[in-house]
Design a protein with these regions (language model features):
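Hydrophobic alpha-helical transmembrane segments of multi-pass integral membrane proteins
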Residues: 5-13, 34-50, 66-67, 121-130, ...
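Juxtamembrane C-cap of transmembrane helices in multi-pass membrane transport proteins
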Residues: 16-30, 35, 42, 80-90, ...
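Specific alpha-helical transmembrane segments that line the substrate/conduction pathway
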Residues: 34, 41-45, 84-115, 158, ...
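Specific transmembrane alpha-helical segments of multi-pass solute transporters/efflux pumps
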Residues: 54-95, 99, 134, 214-232
Length: 298
């Protein structure tokens, strides 16, 4: 019971941290590629320190598992680039709600590999699709501009690449999660190094924001997340993961004054309700592992 309680607060804290990342991305004032590069570099250093402090040997890697981890890292970094670009075009809250379609992306991907999808999951999938349609309804009636629609598209694309990351990570069960994250952010450093510029050490360079993104939102957050997943059953981690979009919407309102209108709230509520039903296995006849093996954290 004590381990479960520890897992609950670790998961809750991880989701609270994750919900504030959008604000730090925008407050940095840097191009998306630079924000992601520094997040990867500082995050890699933080994760390396945590791994060394754990005194556990690094998971053995074969050529195939290393390649899969790198491919997962590419997908994860592309996901960050797309999501952070969405923040610049639409509100953080709306981006986050659309981003929570990712479990359904994973369901559809699983079908390509022969995984059976129950009628109940199809029901949740169509309900989430209905939520997306409602979110888009203001655009379909001409009330929004092309930049708004681009933001929605970027958030959906980010969800796709996060789901792809989760699908690849499923194949890496022999590797400790912290070690997977370390390889992934190192991959991000290599990917984005050509686009990085020398930092300024003057007072106008956002070092406090970047250090927070790397240490807190990457190193500490992933350490808490993976530790919680090891302690908690899937239904609890699935339910606690919905702290993330709620916090993102609240932070967006407090920091930038953005709020969802009634139509967006209705569409977002449908998406989050469908994602909860999918993750927690609502309506399934037989006891089974809930959800699709994805924990929402960016």
């Amino acid at each position: 019971m004590r381990e479960r309680q520890k897992g609950v607060w670790q998961m809750s804290l991880a989701m609270l941290i994750s919900g504030s990342i959008g604000a730090f991305v925008l407050l940095s004032g840097l191009p998306v590629t630079e924000v992601v590069f520094w997040r990867c570099l500082i995050g890699a250093i933080a994760l390396f320190i945590f791994i060394r402090m754990s005194r556990k040997p690094f998971s053995p890697l074969t050529r195939i598992t290393l390649l899969l981890a790198i491919l997962g890292g590419i997908a994860l970094v592309v996901n960050w680039l797309l999501l952070f670009a969405a923040y610049e075009r639409i509100s953080i809250g709306l981006s986050t709600v659309v981003y929570n379609t990712q479990p359904f992306m994973l369901v559809l991907m699983g079908m390509l590999f022969g995984e059976r999808v129950s009628l109940v999951k199809w029901g949740w999938l169509f309900l989430a699709f209905g939520g997306v349609v409602i979110l888009l309804s203001t655009e379909l009636t001409g009330a929004r501009g092309a930049d708004w629609l681009a933001g929605i598209g970027l958030a959906l694309a980010a969800a796709f690449f996060y789901a792809l990351t989760a699908l690849i990570t499923r194949k890496l069960k022999s590797i400790a999660p912290q070690h997977i994250a370390f390889i992934q952010v190192l991959t991000g450093v290599a990917m984005l190094l050509p686009f990085a510029r020398m930092p300024s050490f003057s007072g106008d360079f956002p070092w406090p924001v970047l250090l927070t993104l790397g240490i807190v939102h990457t190193g500490i957050m992933y350490q808490l997340l993976y530790s919680a997943i090891q302690k908690l059953p899937t239904p609890i981690t699935g339910s606690l993961s919905f702290i993330y979009p709620v916090v993102a919407i609240i932070v967006d309102n407090l920091v930038f004054g953005n709020s969802l209108n009634l139509t967006q709230l209705a569409g977002g509520a449908l998406i989050l309700f469908a994602a909860a039903g999918n993750n927690l296995g609502w309506g399934e006849k037989k006891p089974r592992q809930c959800g699709v093996g994805i924990k929402t954290a960016n």
